[in-house]
UniProtKB/Swiss-Prot annotation:
InterPro entries reported in the protein's UniProt record: cAMP_dep_PK_reg_su_I/II_a/b, DD_CABYR_SP17, IQ_motif_EF-hand-BS, Sp17
Biological process per Gene Ontology, one example term: binding of sperm to zona pellucida
Protein name (Swiss-Prot/TrEMBL): Sperm surface protein Sp17
Alphabetical keyword list: Membrane
Organism: Oryctolagus cuniculus (Rabbit)
Compositionally biased tracts (Acidic residues): 92-108
Length: 146
């Protein structure tokens, strides 16, 4: 969060944004007249749910945000990459090609899809031809009038 015309940035506690998003969503959904009283009741209800179910949406949201912003999946070490490449090369040599057997339904669906694509393309070509004919006729008429 930042303040306009300021270089100050405040650190918001993890999960606080999720709590505010939930409150905002409920305020917009319910449209209460007294927003502070509604917010107090909302947070009390949220606390009761958290105590009963042992599930904290703020903590869960913080974990989701952390996973989103700090994705460690792409941070592999070089030695691991080299070992993985060697393993993949040895595996590809040993693998045998697998043939998939399509059922009749799959073949029928593929044929129907191909027919639809071909029909659409033929229609496109026909429309292009009609446009060319119309433009040629319009050009001939303008030449005859001049």
């Amino acid at each position: 969060m930042s303040i306009p015309f300021s270089n100050t940035h405040y650190r918001i506690p993890q999960g606080f944004g999720n709590l505010l998003e939930g409150l905002t969503r409920e305020i917009l959904r319910e449209q209460p007249d007294n927003i502070p009283a509604f917010a107090a009741a909302y947070f009390e209800n949220l606390l009761e749910k958290r105590e009963k179910t042992n599930f904290d949406p703020a903590e869960w949201g913080a974990k989701v945000d952390d996973r989103f912003y700090n994705n460690h999946a792409f941070q592999e070490h070089e030695s691991e990459k080299c070992e993985a490449e060697e393993k993949s090369q040895s595996v590809t040599e040993e693998e045998t090609p697998v043939l998939t057997i399509d059922s009749e339904d799959d073949k029928d669906k593929e044929e129907m899809a191909a027919l639809k694509i071909q029909a659409a393309f033929r229609g496109h070509l026909a429309r292009e031809d009609v446009k060319k004919i119309r433009t040629n006729k319009a050009e001939e008429e303008t030449e005859e009038n001049n």
